[in-house]
Amino acid sequence: MSETPSSSETRPSSAVVLAAGEGIRLRPLTANRPKPMLPAGTRPILEHVLNALIDAGVDDIHLVVGYQANRVRSYFGSTYRDVSITYHTQANQLGSGHALLQARDGPEGPFLLVNGDQIIDHRIVEAVSGAHSDAATLAVVEGPEAVDYGAVHLKGNTITELIEQPASGEFRLFNAGVYAFSQRIFDVLETLSVERGELPLTDAIQSLIDEDDHTVNGVRTDHFWMDATHPWDLLSLSRELLTRGWVDAPTVDTDIYVAESAHIHPDATLVGPVVVDSDVVIEAGAVVGPYAAIGSSATIGSGTVLSDVVIDTDTAIGPNTTAIELVAGQGCELGAALTVGGGPADVVLDEEVYSDVDLGGVIADRVDVGGGATLEPGALIGPGSTIASGVVVRGHIDAGSEVVR
């Protein structure tokens, strides 16, 4: 499909990133940090987003923060990769349109807009930026996910309608969440009212579509993008990143990535794809991988076997543990001989049942698990909990719980 190239006056060099949301469906992992700061591989999702923007030529970033905003500010500071970051606060979570309005005094001229909780290939950003020439430009993807993400009607390069809740299977083109806007979007947003507790960005885009003197363009793309809706999606994200080699650690073998400061015992085995971040210690006899992402300063005990796992920073796993399809948060102490056998499992989140999920378990931040414990498939342990030795964990454990035999 042909695209109308943008002029230097309309090609955006600034970007707004929406990173204010909590991510309720990702609990218990989001109890203490926002969804964009959850791990994708060994880096926060938001870090991957900023990398994509900068790789696409963005030199001015505006972050809209809200829930647990200090977790974002303290991690990134005022610059990232020599690009300045300006923070804007959304005090109340009133939707994506309301979030964007908080950055009205930020970018001058045309700008890009992306979600801070969705990993995108920088080539999608480049395509949207390069095609932008009027009020708005959207990345459009073809696939069955239109039911979940909102469908679009595309006539040539022009979007004629957004369909927020399409009937299943009726539409194949959907909004990928990568945008370029003129300043007109702010004027439109200010004419809209908050209804049903939120101000959706899509309402403003539809208003632009309905205006006779503006055009909303669509750019079709088949480049990689992915987000995490549920805790087990972090495993899928990690698999995709490892498969593509989208990791920071140096390559020591074809698909084995190990930071220089990591300490791998000569008798330990890494099975690719696997990434081991800085200051990790992996002891003798451990087998790590495939599809394992080990965050900085983690410790993997002797004889432990890990496969299809995301282990976040500062977490220690005791010896002789076996864990499959496990997401473990920051600062956890997991005792010796822990068993996490992997899915499938029926998982209950917010009173909704998800069947046949490939999930061994989720352990949120700062959890202590005693030796010889077992996580039944799909177990969810809230932050700050203590699980005694030998306990069999099933279902959901609330934050701060103490579970004994």
What positions do the PLM features span?
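Catalytic-core segments of class I nucleotidyltransferases/pyrophosphorylases
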Residues: 112, 129, 155-247
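Conserved N-terminal catalytic core of the sugar/cofactor nucleotidyltransferase
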Residues: 2-17, 25, 38-39, 43-114
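Extended, small-residue-rich solenoid/repeat segments and analogous flexible loops
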Residues: 198, 207-297, 301, 305
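Short N-terminal binding/cap micro-motifs at the start of the first secondary-structure element
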Residues: 23-28, 147
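The conserved acidic donor/metal-binding loop of glycosyltransferases
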Residues: 115-119
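Conserved donor-nucleotide/metal-binding helix-loop-beta segment in metal-dependent transferases, i.e.
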Residues: 123-148
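Glycine-rich hexapeptide-repeat left-handed beta-helix
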Residues: 308-405
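Short alpha-helix within the catalytic core of nucleotide-sugar-dependent glycosyltransferases
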Residues: 50-51, 101, 108, 121-130, ...
